[in-house]
Amino acid sequence: MSTFDDRDNAFEAKFAHDQEKEFRAEMMALRQIAVWGVSLMQISPDEKEHRTAALQSLEMQKGAKALILAQLADDLSGDVDEDAIKTTYDLFLQDAREKLG
């Protein structure tokens, strides 16, 4: 194996590692935004638990971020605007990235 092949393999491994870290950070942020959004709702604790689980079940679907943020915007309409939800998600994502290194 040549030096070029070694470098190529190292770049591929780093890219895969970075992608996995970003995926994990996004999942952490989605879980946090679901909990945050539901905590703002004026519903019973049991209903909050159910809503949080329902939102978190969307995590693995294609377009999960858009689905979860849209659902929260709909559920919180009148209380929290869509920009505030997106800003809060971005803060959770930044925090998750920092935690993962």
Model-derived regions, located:
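A charge-rich, low-complexity, intrinsically flexible signal that marks solvent-exposed coils, linkers
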Residues: 1-101
